A protein has these predicted regions:
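Outer membrane beta-barrel strand-and-loop segments of large Gram-negative receptors
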Residues: 364, 498-500, 544-550, 648, ...
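Signature of Gram-negative outer-membrane beta-barrel scaffolds
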Residues: 514-618, 788
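Membrane-proximal, glycine/serine-rich, low-complexity loop/turn segments characteristic
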Residues: 17, 29, 56-58, 79, ...
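Structural motif
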Residues: 21-33
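Conserved C-terminal beta-signal and adjacent last beta-strands/turns
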Residues: 759-777, 792-922
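A short, solvent-exposed loop/turn motif at the edges and junctions
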Residues: 40-46, 68-83
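Short, acidic Ser/Thr/Gly-rich low-complexity loop/linker segments typical of extracellular
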Residues: 43-58
Length: 922
């Protein structure tokens, strides 16, 4: 490990260079922010460096010594300055730009500006950052300063997750970032527009807080007004593995259409169950910021999710289509469909230690899943002018999921241990239909009206079966004991109808302040039915019909509220105080028992933003929330949560209260290419719903209860990334601490969890040399419980290296290696490695690409994870796919039609949806 640390800290590339720096102004001496300074190597004719002037007009450019460069200084609306220079020492040179009559795009320039700043939009030229090894959009984005793609495929800009991805101003699969980053070919990307302060609605842009909202708009490379592009990839290898992946895109001014297909058994699911449930289709909770939260449960069937999209075997199929059609009168019709099928084989072993009784349970699970997931969305938007916008959306989400598990469980103390074999099955076919209507209207310069409504129709129908040798709940359930095994089945049906509507009125007092009045209603109706039965050896069914085992519940929740918010900007400060008055009515009916609660509440909120510069801010947010549960925690008859866990709800649960403080700092320096992100969060929940558990051995019976003990959590994070001409480095740290109490066997159980994550990386960024990234991640997880004085600590160290290189004439080599060292405070639990490599060849000018890839070169077998809850800590080891070799061939489908955009006088670029103006506080 010491050698690894030395390598991480040892400089990789050192060469002599000097800088040219100075100040850029107009002829009157006013500083110009956002001017580009680019340097083209006169010998190679390659863009070799660029800089951007900061808010004071200063720029800095580092260049190789004794090399002649052509320097060009440009800014929109000003005549460029151009000259040749060769450096052997640092020099200072200032520039005074003159305004020009013609637009910049009418002036012939050899190289496009790498970065252009237009108000709240930053435009990156892809070619200025590409190194030649990029295959997909994710690879392009990773080269750009301030943009990251995380392990989940989400895009982060300036530390914030991007809400939406558009292509040529049109939503791509409703803006889903993972589908875009993994499927859009890199060679099609011309420019990347980062849309700051993004909002779906133009009219509300200036009266709502959008500082954390970012979107990306991808401009395609070719200048034609209509064309096809895409690629078809096919691959195979030993053991009859396969990959087939067609991607076809058609774009024109008023119509676009996309088809993405994928079929593979190489462990690369294009869309997992987790992604499927994350895919909201653009629907947001209308009451999310009103001070009320009601958690409508989904995916209650207990189907397992993959760990980091890795398993013993994964077979995936995907077919996705997306379209958009519009006219010049403000009408746009769009939609998408997604079908995904995954067959997963999961094999894992779990060691679980219970805090209360020090019993250790060792389980082995062999799981076979078959998940078919479907999504369909249709949208109509009408925006005839700048004062009116209408929108209707409908989203259908349905799936067919089943899971069969062979489970072995061995538990006890010392030599007194029990062994049991279980056969567990789960089936569910949930669906949801979500509809949304929006209307926005601006009346004059002072008044804005908006009306939004949503309706959710959802049903879940999980069925669970368990065949086991031992009855773990002898005194609770009257099973027939004269059978060779206990064959138990449970059915549940939960129907939900949720209606939300709110009306907003905005009054613009002046350029610095406005008032917002909101009237809204949230209405939830749920029905819940569950029962279970025993199947005898003969096939006869024994139903448990007692009310203790059968749930039949009707639940209603209504929140009527009125809110007043005030927004004012003075100097560097923006204040957003608000207050919301709520009237709540909740009731549930279970057989002859009726429970009703009527309450009212006042919930304040406050947001203070300090905008030191356009790219530097500090923000404090305070919010109080009343938190309600849904019907799942209210149903008082027994249900099985798992093979060793029974659950009973509490019909008289009360709402909890959550207080949240959030502090965030952000600094983006385009002059030095240094970004700093930091934040802190504190959350306190009182009267929250916690569990009261009776634990016998490893078997448990849980009931929810309103806890008199607060639940507190703290988090801190920080990240610093820095770029120079050919190097980029990043340091990150994150702390998470939580403390909560539950009742276990009538005793208070206090649980503390502390997580620490550290990361550091250094990467080169050459255009004409191989690039390498080295990094190191260090994670510590500590779990404490008041029942057990032993502190459970798990450590993970992960050094890694990535290499990508373009060489010869058309060869691209990519490789990634990581080593994971996993231990607790007493012993090493596992060490495992990931090493993948890929070599491809594409002849210049050819549409064909050939490649060979090897995954899991070292053929490691398993991965470890750890976690904890109020009852136990556990470490989990699961098998992953073995080494495989894949031979691939790819064909480029790009074809053109129509005229060049510049030749069509009536053509215009599609403006990004939702970011086309609107008033704003000055």
């Amino acid at each position: 490990m010491k050698k690894i640390l030395i390598i991480l800290l040892f400089p990789i590339f050192v060469y002599s260079q000097s800088s040219i720096s100075g100040k850029i102004t107009d002829v009157d001496g006013n500083s110009i922010m956002g001017a580009n300074v680019i340097a083209v190597n006169n010998e190679t004719n390659v863009l070799d460096g660029f800089g951007i002037s900061n808010e004071n007009g200063f720029y800095n450019l580092n260049l190789k010594n004794e090399t002649e460069f052509n320097i060009k200084v440009t800014f929109i609306g000003f005549s460029p300055v151009e000259f040749n220079i060769s450096l052997n020492q640092d020099i200072i040179r200032n520039f005074a730009l003159e305004e020009q009559a013609e637009a910049l795009d009418e002036v012939e320039i050899v190289y496009e500006m790498p970065v252009t700043i237009k108000g709240d939009t930053i435009v990156y030229s892809a070619d200025a950052f590409n190194t030649g090894t990029e295959k997909k959009l994710a690879d392009v984005l990773k080269n750009m300063p301030g943009i990251e793609v995380n392990d989940d495929g989400e895009i982060e800009v300036e530390g914030q997750v991007v809400r939406k991805v558009q292509i040529e101003g049109k939503d791509f699969f409703d803006g889903d970032s993972k589908l875009a980053t993994q499927n859009l070919p890199a060679k099609a990307v011309g420019k990347v527009e980062v849309l700051r302060n993004f909002t779906e609605n133009n009219q509300l842009r200036g009266v709502t807080n959008n500082e954390d909202n970012f979107a990306l708009n991808i401009r395609l490379k070719d200048g034609q007004d209509k064309f096809w592009f895409g690629e078809i990839t096919a691959g195979t290898g030993p053991d009859d593995i396969h990959l087939i992946s067609p991607k076809v895109f058609y774009y024109s001014k008023n119509f676009n259409f996309s088809v993405i297909g994928n079929s593979n058994d190489i462990g690369q699911p294009p869309l997992s169950r987790r992604d499927f449930y994350r895919f909201g289709g653009g629907f947001n909770n209308l009451n999310a910021r009103t001070g009320t939260s009601i958690n409508i449960s989904s995916d209650v069937g207990g189907i397992s999710s993959l760990q980091n999209n890795r398993a013993k075997s994964i077979e995936s199929e995907l077919l996705a289509t997306n379209f958009s059609v519009s006219n010049d009168k403000g009408l746009e019709i769009s939609g998408f469909s997604i079908f995904s099928s995954n067959v997963n084989e999961i094999e894992e072993s779990i060691t679980r230690t219970y805090f209360t009784n020090n019993i250790t349970e060792e389980t082995g699970r062999n799981v076979l899943q078959n998940n078919e997931l479907e999504l369909y969305k249709f949208s109509v938007e009408y925006e005839p002018n700048d004062i009116l916008q209408l929108e209707y959306n409908i989203l259908l989400n349905q799936s067919n999921q089943n899971e069969n598990t062979d489970l072995t469980s061995m538990y006890g103390r010392g030599s007194n241990r029990t062994n049991e074999l279980l056969d567990i099955g789960r089936i569910q076919t949930p669906y949801s239909l979500n509809q949304e209507l929006k209307m926005y209207y601006t009346a004059g310069e002072k008044n804005i009206f908006s009306l939004e409504a949503q309706h959710l129709d959802q049903e879940e129908d999980p069925i669970g079966t368990s065949i086991r040798e031992i009855n773990p709940f002898l005194n609770l359930i009257d099973f027939d004991t004269n059978q060779t095994s206990y064959n138990t089945s449970q059915t549940r049906n939960i129907k939900t109808k949720k209606f939300e509507t709110k009306f907003d009125y905005y009054y613009l007092i002046n350029d610095q302040s406005n008032i917002n009045i909101t009237l809204g209603v949230t209405d939830v109706k749920q029905s819940y039915f569950s029962n279970f039965f025993q199947t005898f050896d003969s096939g006869q069914i024994k139903n448990f019909s007692d009310q203790l085992y059968v749930n039949d519940v009707d639940f209603n929740f209504t929140d009527s509220y009125i809110a007043l918010k005030y927004r004012i900007k003075t100097g560097i400060f923006t204040f957003d105080p608000g207050i919301t008055l709520h009237s709540y009515n909740t009731n549930n009916n279970q057989y002859s028992d009726y429970f009703e609660t009527k309450t009212s509440d006042i919930r304040p909120d406050l947001r203070i933003n300090l905008q030191f510069k356009k790219t530097e801010s500090l923000r404090l947010t305070y919010r109080e929330t009343t938190q309600f549960t849904d019907v799942n925690n209210l149903a008082k008859a027994y249900v099985f949560n798992s093979y060793n866990s029974l659950f009973r709800g509490e019909p008289e649960l009360e709402a909890g209260k959550v207080i949240n403080y959030d502090l965030n700092y952000r600094s983006i320096n385009q002059f030095t290419f240094t970004n700093v992100f930091a934040g802190a969060n504190y959350s306190k929940r009182s009267n929250s719903i916690q569990s009261r558990t009776t634990l016998v051995g490893v078997n448990q019976v849980r009931r929810p209860t309103n806890s008199s003990f607060p639940v507190e959590s703290y988090s801190l994070y920080g990240r610093l990334d820095k770029r120079t001409k050919n190097l980029k480095g990043e340091i990150g740290v994150r702390y998470n601490f939580s403390e909560y109490n539950n009742i276990v066997n009538d005793q208070v159980s206090k649980t503390e969890n502390l997580g620490q994550n550290y990361s550091v990386s250094l990467a080169t960024n050459f255009r004409d040399k191989p690039n390498i990234e080295i990094g190191y991640r260090y994670n510590i997880n500590k779990y404490n419980n008041s029942f057990n004085s032993v502190e459970n600590i798990f450590y993970r160290e992960t050094p890694y290296v990535r290499v990508d290189a373009y060489f010869g004439k058309g060869f691209v080599f990519n490789s990634e290696y990581s080593y994971n060292y996993y231990k607790n405070q007493n012993e090493v639990l596992n060490d495992f490695r990931f090493w993948d490599a890929d070599l491809s060849y594409e002849k210049e000018g050819s549409k064909w690409e050939y490649s060979i890839g090897v995954t899991n070169i070292l053929n490691d077998q398993s991965i470890n994870r750890d976690s904890a809850n109020d009852l136990s800590s556990q470490t989990r080891m699961y098998l992953i796919q073995p080494r495989y070799i894949l031979f691939k061939v790819k064909y480029d489908l790009t074809a053109f039609g129509g005229s060049k955009k510049s030749e069509d006088k009536n053509s215009s670029e599609a403006k990004p949806r939702g970011n086309r103006g609107g008033g704003k506080l000055k």
